[in-house]
């Protein structure tokens, strides 16, 4: 009598599914954290682009501006970043718009984890950063 086992038993299959589930449960949060950190470069790039335009405007007008559309030539006063992960805007710092401008990048969509201190980014014309920038510890 030739009695060969072919295939897998239900228990073996359940063990494989459980192992895959455990690996997925460990890997997915780490993957999402990496994606969120990587998308911050999208917001940072747009903040830098707006800040460069602000500095050019300051050289000519001796003041910064919150009007990104009319004064700096952007499409709107609240700009989406290139990949849409952030919404960029400008506002006067505490000392007034003539002295300082603050560029804010507010996380959008899946980039918004519900913790603005971690998600949103800010940079003012004096070089002060707020939020959790990459490489900040």
Describe every region a protein language model picked out:
Residues 17, 44, 51:
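Conserved catalytic core of two-component sensor histidine kinases
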Residues 27, 34, 54:
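Conserved alpha-helical elements of the SDR catalytic core
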Residues 37, 41, 49-70:
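Alpha-helix exit/C-cap motif
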Residues 59-137:
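Periplasmic/extracellular, small/polar-rich flexible segments of pilin-like filament-forming proteins
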């Amino acid at each position: 009598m030739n009695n060969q086992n072919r295939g897998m038993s239900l228990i073996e299959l359940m063990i494989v599914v459980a192992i895959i589930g455990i690996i997925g449960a460990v890997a997915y949060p780490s993957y999402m954290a990496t994606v969120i950190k990587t998308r911050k470069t999208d917001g940072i790039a747009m903040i830098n682009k707006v800040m460069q335009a602000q500095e050019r405007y300051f050289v000519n007008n001796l003041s910064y501006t919150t009007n990104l559309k009319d004064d700096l030539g952007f499409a709107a006063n609240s700009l989406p970043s290139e990949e849409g992960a952030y919404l960029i805007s400008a506002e006067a710092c505490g000392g007034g718009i003539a002295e300082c401008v603050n560029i804010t990048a507010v996380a959008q969509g899946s980039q918004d984890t519900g913790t603005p201190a971690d998600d949103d980014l800010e940079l003012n014309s004096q070089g002060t950063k707020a939020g959790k920038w990459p490489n900040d510890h």
